[in-house]
């Protein structure tokens, strides 16, 4: 009988290989699955880094000249600090006498705001206020309606009126956050009317109720500022309802306490008080929303994201910004002259692009994303009151950060993907994904790009909008990544050599003594060596390298795995981990879709005497195999 495991590996590998050989009649070079060095602190005075930063400086200046940009801000972060920054030009790009730019000048970050909106969504999900990102938004905000011709087609003729069947209520949170909702691109108002009485929520919803979705949900990516404005509104509504419910519960509790003292006289009064309190809460909230229809959203972002990250120079309201600190954007008129663009608040569109910030504040935001959601001590030092933030060390779970950085849809070019809401680009030269977000609004062009495996981040801002899919971050990454990888690999090699030298110098008797002190019962690698079979013909071979004493295994094929201890404390001597010996030799498939990093469980005989312990079998990939 053929070896089942071996056959499965071989057939799948050949099939994947065949698929990868030709694409669009062009032969592809099959590269190994990329691995990345672990980020550690680097001396920023390294000559290679200084040279890289000089090249980046030159690249930015050349690109500025090519695109008529006179004012530009650039920052690069690594691990938990800004490692390079430079500003070009003046606060007022049309006035050479205005102050020079700094990384503390306010700019409108435009659609980078969407990353904050998305983070709020994940926080509410983690805190249980949203049950699932795949919940329909109608469960939380039934007020929103839009027509869906695809729903009518799928349901047949529908109702007699033909109207009720086309009202779409199936859009989800995840679809809004990943531009998969099928909604139109823009809020149905002239952008100049954002934040005015000519673009209120009632006006927007009345207009949308007469419009249609453009596409089926999840059919393709269609960028939607409307979708994110709606998402922010719904999230704010969830917070508002949660706050009102908490206030009502508190009022009810107080009234119940009063009832205990005045059972007969106060029953009616308590009921009236409950109603009055509920109404007062609603009136107060409505008053705030009437002056700013995204108040609950903006207030939440301020207290639960900006303040905990010590982003104290970021705001949705430009009236909060010192006019002498605002970097001005400019545009080219039809006659070829330049003009400063007037600033404005974004009103209902605020969650899609209304935040003003600084390069220093956005650097703190990048550091947060690059460090698994852990708030840097540098970010937190001036923050004594995190208000409603429930966890001062993490705004979200580490697993949520990983989830938020994952793609939702891969574009057909194979190099571009969209997440919630990161715009991702695969750098073929360096075999690594850039997780980016671009912003364009009111003469500001911004770009944030993260390289999570290397803990590198870039934030660039231009005070002039020009036609480009990327604001220099891809070109800069071509300079940064090779240098950082080289230095990190070099440091890793030096560390491993030092550790090996220390191990060789360590006295063997001290090791044995330490093992005795810890009362550790070690098993010799020799007892695991052998061939393991089962009745179905599956094979698992364990062998040893005599020169190193290390254990290896295979499944009767060419994939060789290193066997290592599962637990360094040796509390589980029967459990081992298997890892591909040299993952750089393989494409990604066997690394992510095979036995790599699996745990295997050996069984021993019942004799507890050390001298007579023998291995009788192993459980691997769900199968039980017995030693022959």
Swiss-Prot record:
Compartment list: Secreted
Glycosites: 45, 68, 198, 241, 313, 335
One Gene Ontology term, aspect cellular component: extracellular region
Annotated region described as Disordered, given as residue ranges: 245-285, 494-516
Residues in the signal sequence: 1-28
Keyword line: Glycoprotein, Secreted, Signal
Biased composition (Low complexity): 245-281, 507-516
Positions with biased composition (Acidic residues): 496-506
Domain of life, per lineage: Eukaryota
TM segment ranges: none
Sequence similarity: Belongs to the beta-lactamase family.
Protein name, per record: Beta-lactamase-like protein 1
Species in which this protein is naturally found: Dictyostelium discoideum
